[in-house]
């Protein structure tokens, strides 16, 4: 994602480059923000019977947001507060921005919003991880998964219902290739990985171009084995999985070395004790007035911040503990 932050005018210019960038933009936008950009809207000048859809530059005051990970879409709704010269009758009406990769928008934040933490969130988006299309295959089942910085999504499951001889494997692998080709067109992964028992992936690699990762299992079990493996380590770091595992360990041996829930984390933040904080994305959206100043203070005291998706591997556990926890320095 390309971005510029004008701290004097409190304006953030953003150009999302990948669908994952839309998630980070969603995190940054709060109700009451001003969003500017080019958009398409039906316009009907006075005296004209029928309107037409035209491209115009306008600004809205945000009232609501709608982010869909699986559809790769971000919609921002609000009331028009600014419009380009020569366009009458639009100001004061409602409008929806559809934010898509390649389209620039501006976010104007309120004066009490900590811009320091904006840079931290944008850096998370900038630390681009490869998008992986994982084909986890064995002789009975193939599971297709899509792995990004936002988590793991199971896209499709295919079963080998034929005999386990060479001719049926040819049909099986040919069918797998067709699904792979379609998923590559749809998701545009950076890397395609073929994982499973050595003999199976060697045969499958004659049909599918991919990085081969031999492992004990294929199918759904193979997806989880791949996630636990070393190749997935960088994703685990970025998504906070390793930090959460450290948190659980420290909680079991020394309760005073961690903070649980907003009150404890805020108290530790005020004392400058935060080493790393894990915060649920839904808590940020539900209580921005509490969470953004907290994260800004963590950032100022050189603590690390991990934003965790509620539907991720550690999201459920984090939600059960109030949506925010921290590892403490002392």
UniProtKB/Swiss-Prot annotation:
Cell cycle keyword on record: no
Keywords, in A-Z order: Cytoplasm, Endonuclease, Hydrolase, Metal-binding, Nuclease
Source domain of life: Archaea
Localisation per UniProt entry: Cytoplasm
GO CC entries: cytoplasm
Coiled coil ranges: none
GO MF assignments: endonuclease activity; metal ion binding
TM region(s), chain numbering: none
Physiological role: May function in recognizing stalled ribosomes, interact with stem-loop structures in stalled mRNA molecules, and effect endonucleolytic cleavage of the mRNA. May play a role in the release non-functional ribosomes and degradation of damaged mRNAs. Has endoribonuclease activity.
Quaternary structure and partners: Monomer.
Designated name of the protein: Protein pelota homolog
Source organism of the structure: Pyrobaculum islandicum (strain DSM 4184 / JCM 9189 / GEO3)
